[in-house]
Swiss-Prot record:
Top-level taxonomy: Bacteria, Pseudomonadati, Pseudomonadota, Alphaproteobacteria, Hyphomicrobiales
The family this protein is said to belong to: Belongs to the DnaJ family.
UniProt-annotated binding residues for Zn(2+) 2: 165, 168, 187, 190
Annotated protein name in UniProt: Chaperone protein DnaJ
Domain comment quoted from the record: The J domain is necessary and sufficient to stimulate DnaK ATPase activity. Zinc center 1 plays an important role in the autonomous, DnaK-independent chaperone activity of DnaJ. Zinc center 2 is essential for interaction with DnaK and for DnaJ activity.
Organism encoding this protein: Bartonella henselae (strain ATCC 49882 / DSM 28221 / CCUG 30454 / Houston 1)
Gene: dnaJ
Domain of life, per lineage: Bacteria
Amino acids binding Zn(2+) 1: 148, 151, 201, 204
Record's subcellular location: Cytoplasm
One Pfam family this sequence matches: DnaJ_CXXCXGXG
Length: 381
């Protein structure tokens, strides 16, 4: 018995698209075959998750599933192969024609040519910020359904071929009288395919496809952002009976960086400096993500939180890679700790020699604070 799609993804029936996508990505990452090499249970879960998301992400398929459950897609199953398969565009026409045809006694219709589009697949990939900066070509292994090479996709044993169904005569549907109505339904013998296989292919067991790990080369462009989606047309599951292959979607996530934080095409970096450097001024060297160094001059009296902008030292823009964002340096002044007696005495001497011009903000603040409390005391007397 099939598990409820909502239970598979761990969401409620009322969840929105954002929560649905988030749940799918989390589970797909957890059970991805690359992270669970040789684990058949993880591979089964991965495909089960993909099947559930393939239905629930599409408003029409989701509505049909909410109304009919798994029965909404049973007519399109091919009896085997990848659980991702069987969600072709023509499937929902069959569902509603079956539903209304059985009530209203709809007329006979011609069977389609039987071609079914392969299912779309997804792959989660994590890249470093450096890789997002420069771009890369990655090799991935993706489990998918491919056309059986033993029977060339016919599903029949070598030397034989599928036969026209003797029950529906190739139409894929049969009609029966029920009272005053003529009811048309899917052929119970060929399950709507219009043909039967007497001698199934021993390799694919008549399913026309087999499971295979494929190695693909994926181009990651410079400037990609977290949650970028790359579509590889035709790299999903193989179609059935000459139908087109599905697509492969690469979902990218960018790892957090040790030094840089990203906001769009801009980079931000916090740099700690000593209290002395902040007071007397100085300079330091910083490298951007392409390894080019730049010197940052710190003027005398630099305050904590001051920001310096290095123009054109940020990330390349995805669709205008010749244009780069900026790098922002955020200054953090580090207060000295574990002072020696001599250092303590020098600081105390410095404090005695200081006046309000050395610390205008703190002097002004405490003067105003003193005046504030004096006013309160005067009112209470």
């Amino acid at each position: 018995m099939k598990v409820d799609y909502y239970e598979i993804l761990g969401v409620t029936r009322e969840c929105d698209d954002k929560k649905l996508k988030s749940a799918f990505r989390k589970l797909a990452m957890q059970y991805h075959p690359d992270r669970n090499a040789g684990d058949k249970e993880a591979e089964r879960k991965f495909k089960e998750i993909g099947e559930a998301y393939e239905v629930l992400k599409d408003p029409q398929k989701r509505a049909a599933y909410d109304r009919f459950g798994h029965a909404a897609f049973e007519n399109n199953n091919n009896g085997g192969g990848s659980p991702f398969s069987g969600f072709s565009a023509g499937g929902f026409a069959d569902i509603f024609e079956d539903f209304f045809g059985e009530i209203m006694g709809g007329g006979h219709r011609k069977r389609s040519d039987g071609r079914e589009r392969g299912a779309d697949l997804s792959y989660n990939m994590e890249v470093t910020l450096e890789e997002a900066f420069s771009g890369k070509t990655a090799q991935i292994n993706i489990p998918s359904s491919v056309v059986c090479d033993a029977c060339e996709g016919s599903g029949a044993k070598k030397g034989s071929k599928p036969q026209t169904c003797g029950t529906c005569h190739g139409a894929g549907r049969v009609r029966a009288a029920q009272g005053f109505f003529s009811i048309e339904r899917t052929c119970p013998v060929c399950h709507g395919r219009g043909e039967t296989i007497k001698d199934p292919c021993p390799k694919c067991q008549g399913t026309r496809r087999v499971e295979k790990n494929r190695s693909l080369s994926v181009n990651i462009p410079a400037g990609i952002e977290d949650s970028t989606r790359i579509r590889l047309s035709g790299e999903g599951d193989a179609g059935i009976r000459g139908g087109p292959s599905g697509d492969l979607y690469i979902f990218l996530s960018v790892k957090p960086h040790e030094f840089f934080q990203r906001e769009g095409a801009d980079l931000h970096c916090r740099v700690p400096i000593s209290m002395v450097t902040a007071a007397l001024g100085g300079e330091f060297e910083v490298s951007d993500l392409d390894g080019i160094k730049a010197r940052v001059k710190i003027p005398e009296g630099t305050q904590n939180g001051r920001q310096f902008r290095l123009k054109g030292k940020g990330m390349p823009m995805l669709r205008r890679q010749q244009v780069r964002g900026d790098l922002y340096i955020h200054i953090t002044i580090e207060t000295p700790q574990k002072l020696t007696q001599e250092q303590r005495e020098l600081l105390q001497k410095f404090e005695k020699l200081s006046n309000h011009e050395n610390s205008p903000q703190s002097h002004g603040f405490f003067s105003r604070m003193k005046e504030f409390f004096e006013n309160i005391s005067g009112k209470n007397e």
